[in-house]
Amino acid sequence: MWLLRCVLLCVSLSLAVSGQHKPEAPDYSSVLHCGPWSFQFAVNLNQEATSPPVLIAWDNQGLLHELQNDSDCGTWIRKGPGSSVVLEATYSSCYVTEWDSHYIMPVGVEGAGAAEHKVVTERKLLKCPMDLLARDAPDTDWCDSIPARDRLPCAPSPISRGDCEGLGCCYSSEEVNSCYYGNTVTLHCTREGHFSIAVSRNVTSPPLLLDSVRLALRNDSACNPVMATQAFVLFQFPFTSCGTTRQITGDRAVYENELVATRDVKNGSRGSVTRDSIFRLHVSCSYSVSSNSLPINVQVFTLPPPFPETQPGPLTLELQIAKDKNYGSYYGVGDYPVVKLLRDPIYVEVSILHRTDPYLGLLLQQCWATPSTDPLSQPQWPILVKGCPYIGDNYQTQLIPVQKALDLPFPSHHQRFSIFTFSFVNPTVEKQALRGPVHLHCSVSVCQPAETPSCVVTCPDLSRRRNFDNSSQNTTASVSSKGPMILLQATKDPPEKLRVPVDSKVLWVAGLSGTLILGALLVSYLAVKKQKSCPDQMCQ
């Protein structure tokens, strides 16, 4: 970093000092373009110049180099229009350094000085922001799959491969129009303040109806496509028209618009169908208000992809009991039966296993407990009814939200709740608790997509939303705990435990005995006190 500062300081200092002893040489005009991956720097000779300029650059050690085509160092020199020279240097070039969120490259123009000695006649520090949004080069499938007759020019020829791909377009040196749009959506935000949006019909499946693609906020003739082929449609319009919105935040101005398309509807004698999803394309260009430069951000927002195709297959479910409220670990098969005290909390989790579809949602329909492994056996006690806590229990079930975590990438595949342990009562003997195991069971189903209104419901008297919509569910399945729970009475009864009735005669005898004992203790205490307070001769 110190060396870089020294190099920059030396370059700046040489500019100031050499200004006094600068040899007579033609002035040059130059233009810098910050591309997605490289500098594009064009130097133009004025009319007095007799020879093309020679470009030079300083490396990180401060050494001077004449620039030439060097793929190892990421520099290319080509002749531009007229007598101009164009330099293209990648941001990973040997002569480029990262500095204060920018890529910088000190360059110069070399000319003839006194006695025909070569001297640096012009110096410039190329500087491009690092956060300039880079467009990905189109995939080869997006380019090769377009027939030559359907290709829509992206930029006029001649143009280099780097410049073309820097625009997010396809390149073919064998074609007359060497730079053309790929099978996708390509957005350009121009320095002059225009949108340029190219849409391929194959950006969706089935393909788009191109003649139905239009701007959502304005549909007059001035906002119609400027060019169309069988495979593409191209919109170009200024930021001040076609319903474009502008929002200024600090130093940034954001211009936004939206494209929509009509669905392809097939009409039959008994109804109409469509196989198209909704097409809505949101585009955005951001500019710096205080700088007359290229856009600082270009974004295309498409709707989420359609849900993946489903196939029939087994759905594996699991009901587990966690060892604590954090759900950090669970009881395994070898840990059962789980021994708990009455009124202890039990933390339950029901999960979908071996699925990676983020759109799946797990629904708990009914959950209940039985004294045997048979979920249909009697007696039964309801825990959840239609996914909500059973309101007839004075210790109501608590629904626990599931948060996304590193070990839980699909929270919609899990449902959690806690219950307070209880014991079944013998129906033949009044208020006699049945001793033995308690098994948990749940009936569950799956809905899609998860966390949408069709998959949630608000439980009565609860603010928490629960999954519930029979129209979006598959067949209900059942799952049970891996083993039973053995419930024990606590060694110390809680305050609300029922009192045992006691005979009044027993209470009377106990009270009289307590009174006599207290009286004897009082007499003994007074005697001892009197003995300590009197002199020995008087107490004898």
Swiss-Prot record:
Topological domain spans for side Extracellular: 19-505
Function per UniProt:
Component of the zona pellucida, an extracellular matrix surrounding oocytes which mediates sperm binding, induction of the acrosome reaction and prevents post-fertilization polyspermy. The zona pellucida is composed of 3 to 4 glycoproteins, ZP1, ZP2, ZP3, and ZP4. ZP4 may act as a sperm receptor.
User: Where is the secretion signal located?
Assistant: 1-18
Residue ranges that the UniProt entry lists as topological domain Cytoplasmic? 527-540
Q: Which GO terms describe its molecular function?
A: acrosin binding; identical protein binding; structural constituent of egg coat
**Pfam families assigned:** Trefoil, Zona_pellucida, ZP-N, ZP1_ZP4_Ig-like
ZP domain location: 188-466
Q: Which GO terms describe its biological process?
A: acrosomal vesicle exocytosis; binding of sperm to zona pellucida; negative regulation of binding of sperm to zona pellucida; positive regulation of acrosome reaction; positive regulation of humoral immune response; positive regulation of T cell proliferation; prevention of polyspermy
| CDD domains named in the record | Trefoil (cd00111)
Q: What is its subcellular localisation?
A: Cell membrane
Protein name, entry field: Zona pellucida sperm-binding protein 4
Q: Which residues are glycosylated?
A: N69, N202, N219, N267, T302, N470, N474
Spans through the membrane = 506-526
Q: Which family does it belong to?
A: Belongs to the ZP domain family. ZPB subfamily.
* Bilayer disposition of the protein: Single-pass type I membrane protein
Keywords carried by this UniProt record: Cell membrane, Cleavage on pair of basic residues, Disulfide bond, Extracellular matrix, Fertilization, Glycoprotein, Membrane, Receptor, Secreted, Signal, Transmembrane, Transmembrane helix
Q: Name one GO cellular component term.
A: egg coat
For this chain, the annotated S-S bridges are: C367-C442
User: What are the residue ranges of the propeptide?
Assistant: 463-540
Domain P-type, by residue range, is 141-183
Domain description: The ZP domain is involved in the polymerization of the ZP proteins to form the zona pellucida.
Query: Mind telling me which PANTHER family this protein's record contains?
Result: ZONA PELLUCIDA SPERM-BINDING PROTEIN (PTHR23343), ZONA PELLUCIDA SPERM-BINDING PROTEIN 4 (PTHR23343:SF31)
Tissues where the protein occurs = Expressed in oocytes.
